Amino acid sequence: MTDFVAIYRSPSYSPMQHRSNDTAILDGTVAHLTSKGWRVTAVSEADIEQGRLPAVPLYLNMCQGPLASERLMPLELDGAVVLNRPSSVLNCHRHRLVRQLAGNRVAFPHTVVVPSSATPATDVHLASLGDDGRRLWVKRGDVHAERPEDVVATTRSGLAAAMAAFTARDIPWVAVQEHVEGPVVKFYGVADGRFFRYYRADGGPSGAATAPELDGDRLRALAFEAATLLGLEVFGGDVAFPEPDRPVLIDINDWPSFAPFRDAAADAIAGYVVDRMRARS
């Protein structure tokens, strides 16, 4: 029998439309483990921030805030398993994500992280972005998108206004990313490959669920390459296909909601956790 802590994500770090789904995937994983006789203590991200942390060998970690992640850091040094590792969660914060992916030759669009107060006409980093009328994406540069206005589409001519909107909301950094043409695919995975699903975003999970016209093998390879680089064990994200055999990573996140495949994903994550704990004993 194993005692473990399930740490639920703060609602402030979940996109509004996914808050119940984020809770549900951890609930489902916990249910599979407790059905095997494991004993759970459920805590919130706020509990972790305030230092209320039971000592157990395993922590299922859905925290995304920097303070909670920093408080979880010492646990691995003490021999506990933390899934996902707090370092991997922090790697998914946009400013770190861009640096990690761009520096390791992962197929990823040209992206610059700048102060939201920067002036597009004179900023040397923004000057590296194209000025040919193509679409640009402006994303909050600290943590993940929490609401629709955290990711906006614009062009070079509208960039100053888009960035000013982030400044007005007291978001100090933005990531400005070149648009990648082609269909967008959403993917979900578990580190050892026992679970990997994807579907075209424009078709929905019940539509073109496997996107057969796109190169699934290269998609899978790219997703796992990025997850391994960041240290993620439970992950999901988005890829664009400018060509059917050329996936480009747009985004990757720690422990997504897995909403279209929740039951199968919860079972797979629980199985992965059991095997991880068995391997260390």
Give the residues covered by each predicted segment:
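Active-site nucleotide/adenylate-binding loops and adjacent lid/helix of ATP-dependent enzymes
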Residues: 2-10, 79, 87-174, 181-182
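Conserved N-proximal alpha/beta basic substrate-recognition cap immediately N-terminal to
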Residues: 6-119
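C-terminal active-site "lid" helix and adjoining low-complexity regulatory extension at the edge
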Residues: 29, 228, 242-281
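A short glycine-rich, hydrophobically flanked beta-strand micro-motif that places a catalytic Asp/Glu
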Residues: 42-45, 185, 232-244
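A short beta-strand motif that forms the metal-chelation/ATP-contact edge
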Residues: 56-60, 139, 187-189, 245-260
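Short glycine-rich anion-binding loops that position phosphate/pyrophosphate groups of nucleotides
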Residues: 64-66, 141-143, 255
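Generic preference for hydrophobic
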Residues: 82, 111, 137-138, 176, ...
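Phosphate-binding site of ATP-dependent enzymes
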Residues: 150-230
